[in-house]
Amino acid sequence: MIIFVSEEPERRLAIVSNLYALVLKPVGKKPSDKPLCAIELLQKNDLKKYGFKRLTSHEIFGVIGLIEVNGLLFVGAITGKSKVAQPCPGETVNKIFAVDFFCLNDNSWDFIEIDSSGYPVLPETASTEYQDALPKHPCYELKKLLSNGSFYYSSDFDLTSTLQHRGYGQHSLSTDTYEEEYMWNSFLMQEMITYRDHLDTNLKQILDDEGFLTTVIRGFAETFVSYVKKLKVALTIISKQSWKRAGTRFNARGVDDEANVANFVETEFIMYSSQYCYAFTQIRGSIPVFWEQGTSLINPRVQITRSFEATQPVFDKHIMKSVEKYGPVHVVNLLSTKSSEIELSKRYKEHLTHSKKLNFNKDIFLTEFDFHKETSQEGFSGVRKLIPLILDSLLSSGYYSYDVREKKNISEQHGIFRTNCLDCLDRTNLAQQIISLAAFRTFLEDFRLISSNSFIDDDDFVSKHNTLWADHGDQISQIYTGTNALKSSFSRKGKMSLAGALSDATKSVSRIYINNFMDKEKQQNIDTLLGRLPYQKAVQLYDPVNEYVSTKLQSMSDKFTSTSNINLLIGSFNVNGATKKVDLSKWLFPIGEKFKPDIVVLGLQEVIELSAGSILNADYSKSSFWENLVGDCLNQYDDKYLLLRVEQMTSLLILFFVKADKAKYVKQVEGATKKTGFRGMAGNKGAVSIRFEYGATSFCFVNSHLAAGATNVEERRSDYESIVRGITFTRTKMIPHHDSIFWLGDMNYRINLPNEDVRRELLNQEEGYIDKLLHFDQLTLGINSGSVFEGFKEPTLKFRPTYKYDPGTGTYDSSEKERTPSWTDRIIYKGENLLPLSYSDAPIMISDHRPVYAAYRAKITFVDDKERLSLKKRLFTEYKQEHPEEPGSLISDLLSLDLDNKSTDGFKSSSESSLLDIDPIMAQPTASSVASSSPVSSASASLQPVRTQNSSQSRTPIKKPVLRPPPPPAHKSVSAPAPSTSKEKSPTPQTSTASLSSVTKNIQENKPLAQNRRIPPPGFSQNILTPKSTSNLASPMSSKVDLYNSASESTRSAQDARQQTPTAFAASRDVNGQPEALLGDENPIEPEEKAKLNHMTLDSWQPLTPK
């Protein structure tokens, strides 16, 4: 494809394929306008009259979507790729190494090359001042991310699916069947996909087959060619990381409220030969509980942030998703029994065994394998002790296999191994590699391709298998941490050398640096790509239908939205380091059972003593004391409260409780901290914050301890501003980005009066004395002037100053310092949906402060997403019926193309070249028993894919079959060659002039003699299993192609691609452009006074008027 631009009569971009052109133009020019883009699909020849000219010399290999950055609309396109894998004939995987973004509504970036730093490349004559004034390309960071070698796409098949799911030979590119979880450009493509969904089948096919919609995954793909005895096989790994909880190592941990876990990766190992096709799938993912880990340099502390009861429903949801998709899940937990990991491991097991939805030892199995302990004596080879522990599950879940000659499925995999360590990286890589090899060996023995006593670790296919897994481990680690995997030396060579150990040490140091200094920027780039930044909106495609539906939906919002009220109790208490057990009922239930809030958020300050030693060595066990004390008090009545979140920073602590029956409405619970003590280096001052969403309404709570001192008003203002800027949640959400905000804590604001004047007013208690003192309150003055806490309100304050008391008494400070009584402890709020009910202090005397509480009623909005979607679909149908031929709509534009009478040459099927149709010398086993990790050994250099016809038809999903054992042997070849070892003579090289007949003959020589299948052993089935993805048989075997044609096609493809194509692609060819390793190299390189309680009712709490 090629991209063109025209300014006549208005700016438009056209992406042109063989037959059609996709024309895009911006709609609306005001900066306040929402990002809109119009789209047309025209015949290629219709572009001539619009004065289009080529925008770039680079070929466009696929469109990845639309994005708006700083008011500019860009279309993203793949402009550099290399072929890296071919799991089956006609299925090619491409690695993306170059992406460009072309602006739709501004020509400033047309025809400009960008340097490696994102700035325009200027002629040498340009002045330095002019160069310094130039801006960086708005999409440079996205471009750099997408071009880092971890993103892949395919023009031939659905790369988001597994081979078993899509079916052998089913090369569908329809977005109807894509798994959105692995589609990393889903935000960029979502409006284009929605638009496509409104088209009929023929029009969908054009968009699919012309490559206008490209699905991009992130992960790994690579193919090696090897031999199993003398049978040539292609070994492939395709790995896909989910974007649902994507992020860098310490920014993405555990599970979220939607049951998505960090670093969730689906990995499929595929073997293809002329006889059989085999596939085995595994998954990995962070432990599905709510936990976090700090970024301290040494042994960062693991913190579980949500109670067991509140976590269990989300845990069950995550595991059940896997069970429904894959079948029984066997969990392999590699965490150690060290103090840093044991708590997390115990919680994992408790959730598995105490679940009421999961059938333990039926739907879910658990094997605990302390990796560090098991490998401490005999090295990493001790991981092999894992196989006997999981062997029963390995045999019962089986694998996917397909008979290439008879074109039918033999078996399916009905179960999955879910492996994890702490990061799901280094230990997990090694364990998954061992499991994969055990499953592959089982397949080879079942099908009598090897015998049980002929398997040796030095076999070439074993070395290639291990190298694939090592390369895969490095790539996944690069994505998550920025370095290669640890232990990869053992993965490749089966042993750990001194160089490997030194390499691991270097990687560990690199990870510490990256985690602390680089991950924040990387996380923001990921969030930009995924559309997670505040107020970031997808570019919408202008369409009269869409405008009609959007307007109608807005006017009919009452049909899918509802409102409700909830009660909240907010409390703040400076406990002055006290750990004395006390009844908190007068604070948490000030009118007893008559007010039991739905949500309770408490902020505590000075939970540890503020001494230099305690600040540097914070005792985080104090949080457990207050969690239990508050929890016991809240649960003294029939209503049960669950602890959903705890956030602690040194002496600051915030607790979030919710009624058990309301917990299902709470999502996206997060925490954040900001230090302001000692210029931001210490946590004695600062803030801890939590945020969550209740229904469709967002809440944020900030518990702060600001600078002390009667005259330090400016320092407190500075602390406030620092906290507002510094508190950042995931997806770069900040405090102002919420519907309801509560700020509470020991704010340390004082009364601007002499001490004796304040004490006299408090002693005399004349009418209106509270209001009189408030006229001199620093916080009240600051809010009224707008100098601090702009937009915040405080309920009517009618209680006496809360500081400073002699502990255990009602007497204000009688010490030598005699501090002026002040309202240091406050609760203020911001939000139109909030109604204050009560604001007072509580008579709890364990500290020199009094606790304060505020009760609120909040209006909550709920959105019924299913009803909204149903209404949206109905409105679309109504519009189409009323405007069947409205001009200007994409549908009528496409229908006018008269597709039935047009040539469909672009959809004709071409002959497919199989990777195994190439001369056998290509991947001949070498004398060395260890395969090189050089990319030259990868089959990517030899892949010659030809575009095939793609189907846009939806596949009807088939319900998950019951568990079955692995299959019986399919073919028994009486002429099977003798076992091959590394000492055997390699197959005779073919000359470079090998003809088609000689290549075909060579493959046919490996064909086993036809004979009856032997009777399967007990427990095995002779039934042929139907693939879940289709009821059709696979397409016939692709015909063989002439070797020189394939080579010449590859040469042309390489010339069309960018010159920056990886060296591996070029290094594998001789001076004549022929693939050397394929043709003649015998040894190829490898790869607030209160009313009496008994007279007080809830009705007596009338809404308070803010000051």
UniProtKB/Swiss-Prot annotation:
Residues 943-956, 987-1005, 1020-1038, 1045-1063, 1097-1107 have a biased composition (Polar residues). SUPFAM superfamilies: DNase I-like (SSF56219). The lineage of its organism: Eukaryota, Fungi, Dikarya, Ascomycota, Saccharomycotina. This is Polyphosphatidylinositol phosphatase INP53. Belongs to the synaptojanin family. In the central section; belongs to the inositol 1,4,5-trisphosphate 5-phosphatase family. GO terms for cellular component: actin cortical patch; cytoplasm; membrane. It catalyses: a 1,2-diacyl-sn-glycero-3-phospho-(1D-myo-inositol-4,5-bisphosphate) + H2O = a 1,2-diacyl-sn-glycero-3-phospho-(1D-myo-inositol 4-phosphate) + phosphate. One of its GO terms (biological process) is phosphatidylinositol dephosphorylation. Residues 926-1107 are annotated as: Disordered. The gene is INP53. PROSITE patterns: SAC. Present with 1520 molecules/cell in log phase SD medium.
